[in-house]
């Protein structure tokens, strides 16, 4: 085994650690800081499972402005499963006012049952500024109760 590459790697790692340790964190001056626009998405505490298996999730959202189309997307999972089921998307209006969203989707039959579930809602923009990459305005994860009906 050659010692020179190992010494070079160790010296480089030490240099990075020492440089990072002396860097001061950036802080904003409260007098000149511009507040971020108020953007949020919420999830209602109850979701519905229809007799045909369609899941309906809902909540509210608020966003200030956008340069491209904005959507509220949602997904649901249940139990210890790592599988998340998408429940569609709603086109959002970014005018600073609070709006309702309702998404419906039909996951694999029998995959969701009445009871506790975890829902994640995302307020996401698709714009020319990012190519194909989305810009996330807000994300909310919440435990909900799925009911029949």
What is each model feature region?
Residues 45, 88-93, 108:
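Beta-strand-rich interaction surfaces with strong enrichment in secreted/lumenal proteins
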Residues 121-131:
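Enriched for extracellular/lumenal, surface-exposed ectodomains of secreted and cell-surface proteins
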Residues 51, 90-100:
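Short proline/glycine- and polar residue-rich coil/turn motifs
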Residues 1-29:
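Secretory targeting and sorting signals
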């Amino acid at each position: 085994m050659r010692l020179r590459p190992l010494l070079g790697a160790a010296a480089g790692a030490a240099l990075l650690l020492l440089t990072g340790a002396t860097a001061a964190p950036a802080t904003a001056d409260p007098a000149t800081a511009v507040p971020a626009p108020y953007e949020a998405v919420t999830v209602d505490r109850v979701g519905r499972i229809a007799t045909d298996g369609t899941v309906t999730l809902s909540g509210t959202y608020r966003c200030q402005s956008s340069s491209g189309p904005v959507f509220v997307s949602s997904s649901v999972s249940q139990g210890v499963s790592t599988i998340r089921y998408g429940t569609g998307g709603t086109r959002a209006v970014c005018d600073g006012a609070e709006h309702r969203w309702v998404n419906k989707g039909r996951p694999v039959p029998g995959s969701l049952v009445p009871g506790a579930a975890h829902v994640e809602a995302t307020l996401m923009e698709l714009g020319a500024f990012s190519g194909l990459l989305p810009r996330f305005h807000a994300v909310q994860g919440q435990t909900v109760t799925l009911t029949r009906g």
